[in-house]
Regions:
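Bacterial Sec-dependent N-terminal signal peptides
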Residues: 1-25
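Tryptophan-anchored aromatic micro-motifs
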Residues: 21-53
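Extracellular/luminal recognition modules and glycoprotein regions
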Residues: 23-27, 52-64, 70, 97-98, ...
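Beta-sheet ligand-binding and adhesion/scaffold domains
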Residues: 99-151
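N-terminal glycine/threonine-rich, aromatic-flanked beta-hairpin/loop signature
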Residues: 51-92, 130-133
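Exposed acidic/polar residues on beta-strands and adjacent loops within beta-sheet cores, strongest
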Residues: 29, 75-102, 112-114, 146-151
């Protein structure tokens, strides 16, 4: 009898976890499919890397299949073709992963700013978290919230 009750509780638990994950996934996919949102970074942990890169990210912006990252004390933006104050022009490509559908990555691959990658994991309540890489080095871990640009 104990085994049957344990088995039933395990099934109920797994169904509940599946429902929560499906809900999380649906919200994340809504943001990704709409393709217009800003991640307002609320908390960061800067990590000193071997190449001595530390930067404080303040905002990640996604519009369709392009994305950008604004950071630093003077809101510098790293984009696809230049790095200057408050500029949002042609930004890096936004990609999604089949393994992690609630996650996006923004990859910047041009001669001047090559190697930067932002990963963003989206939760149900509009919260998100992620890491910013320079090539394979993590130099910033962040938590934030999403603002939908369509509203």
């Amino acid at each position: 009898m104990k085994r049957i009750i344990t088995f039933i509780l395990a099934i109920i638990g797994s169904v509940s976890i599946y429902a929560q994950e499906k809900s999380r996934l649906t919200d994340a996919l809504k943001y990704i499919e709409d393709g217009r949102f800003i991640v307002i970074v609320e908390e960061t942990t800067d990590i000193k890397t071997q190449s001595n890169r530390t930067m404080h990210s303040t905002r990640v912006e996604v519009k369709g299949d392009i994305g950008s990252m604004i950071w630093g004390s003077s809101d510098k933006i790293i984009s696809n073709n230049h790095w200057n104050d408050n500029a949002v022009d042609k930004q890096a490509k936004v990609t999604t992963s089949r393994k992690k559908p609630s996650s996006i990555a923004i990859e910047i691959d041009n001669a001047f700013n090559r190697g930067y990658r932002i990963e963003c994991n989206i939760d149900t309540d509009g919260k998100c978290s992620g890491m910013i890489y320079y090539y394979n080095e993590v130099f910033c871990i962040y938590k934030g919230r999403i603002v939908d640009l369509n509203e």
